[in-house]
């Protein structure tokens, strides 16, 4: 049994956009709409978590001498 590859941010966003389009059409049966909504919420959380992770990575930047220093937008 192969382990499922974790979805990338871009893949999750594409699926989320597809779900939103289906729900916006308005002709989705209630049960399907609920399932789409639940899947959309999972994808939304996945995207949020990935963005949070990247944000934490960007809090520090590497100086030329290799030292990690807190990132300050004013210095950029």
UniProtKB/Swiss-Prot annotation:
Its EC number is 3.1.11.6. Coiled coil: none annotated. Bidirectionally degrades single-stranded DNA into large acid-insoluble oligonucleotides, which are then degraded further into small acid-soluble oligonucleotides. The gene is xseB. Belongs to the XseB family. GO terms for cellular component: cytosol; exodeoxyribonuclease VII complex. One of its GO terms (molecular function) is exodeoxyribonuclease VII activity. Pfam families: Exonuc_VII_S. Heterooligomer composed of large and small subunits. It is an enzyme of class 3 (hydrolase). This is Exodeoxyribonuclease 7 small subunit. Keywords: Cytoplasm, Exonuclease, Hydrolase, Nuclease. GO terms for biological process: DNA catabolic process. InterPro entries: Exonuc_VII_S, Exonuc_VII_ssu_sf. The lineage of its organism: Bacteria, Bacillati, Bacillota, Bacilli, Bacillales. It comes from the Bacteria. It is found in: Cytoplasm. It catalyses: Exonucleolytic cleavage in either 5'- to 3'- or 3'- to 5'-direction to yield nucleoside 5'-phosphates.
